Amino acid sequence: MGAGHSHDHPGGNERSLKIALALTGTFLIAEVVGGVMTKSLALISDAAHMLTDTVALAIALAAIAIAKRPADKKRTFGYYRFEILAAAFNALLLFGVAIYILYEAYLRLKSPPQIESTGMFVVAVLGLIINLISMRMLSSGQSSSLNVKGAYLEVWSDLLGSVGVIAGAIIIRFTGWAWVDSAIAVLIGLWVLPRTWILLKSSLNVLLEGVPDDVDLAEVEKQILATPGVKSFHDLHIWALTSGKASLTVHVVNDTAVNPEMEVLPELKQMLADKFDITHVTIQFELAPCEQADAAQHFNASPALVGSKSLAAGGN
């Protein structure tokens, strides 16, 4: 038997995240106050969206800090799931906020209040500037850090919301159509809901230890089987500790003519890292399928001996 392990360490630009968080968090308060003073539901709904930016930035920072904490005897996998729990909470909170905004917009469409378009415009422009600065701060790190990239995309999407509010303020200023404010709030709410569902679904998938969305299980099975020295495999499991940190365990039945630890293991580890970005790998080698080969069917991840070369050949 043999086992292979490799570990990666998360990184990120903490300084950029801290500056972006300070800017976004400060303006979030200003936007809520501005929305209340100008009676603009569009501003308030955009502030709700900016709240997700603030939480996303905080999660990214927390994930970097927590990732530095070593695993202990109680949490042998470390503390990576904190990020996922926070993301799931963020999604549930967003659902509630978006539904409230849609309901409030429905009431306002029937009786639109007087909107202070000038104040609405000024606050939205300031929000646009804050988003542009935050994007600039995060742009350098978003290509190398998944956390920073997620925060960058949150800020980018909120920037579009600010543009919508600015357009609404201009329309109200020159036409007096107060209903436009509620209409824009509805659009922002409808835009946020699908993204919220995607975030919640992805979080639940990680918590349920499902196969990561960016990993093609069938292709992994195919590539394992194609590795020289592999006769078959079973008990294959792929899951993620957190976003971008996939793990894999598998039982491999190896050819008796090869040394599995010296010949097969390096090939499998290299292939999984290069093609699927799976770097935390545990492989058990066997000369014949163990008793867990039948039990593996209960997981429905890959039926026992789904990777037999005879089956693969018949499928071509």
UniProtKB/Swiss-Prot annotation:
Induction notes from the record: Most highly expressed when the upstream czcCBA transcript is not induced.
Record note on what altering D53 to A/E/N does: Hypersensitive to zinc
UniProt xrefs under SUPFAM superfamilies: Cation efflux protein cytoplasmic domain-like, Cation efflux protein transmembrane domain-like
All ranges on the Cytoplasmic side of the membrane: 1-16, 68-81, 136-151, 195-316
Transmembrane segments: 17-37, 47-67, 82-102, 115-135, 152-172, 174-194
Function (record text): Mediates a low-level metal ion resistance, probably by efflux of cations from the cytoplasm into the periplasm. Also mediates resistance to cobalt, cadmium and zinc via regulation of the Czc system. May repress expression of the Czc system by an export of the inducing cations. Binds and transports zinc. Can also bind cobalt, copper and nickel.
Protein name according to UniProt: Metal cation efflux system protein CzcD
Higher taxonomy: Bacteria, Pseudomonadati, Pseudomonadota, Betaproteobacteria, Burkholderiales
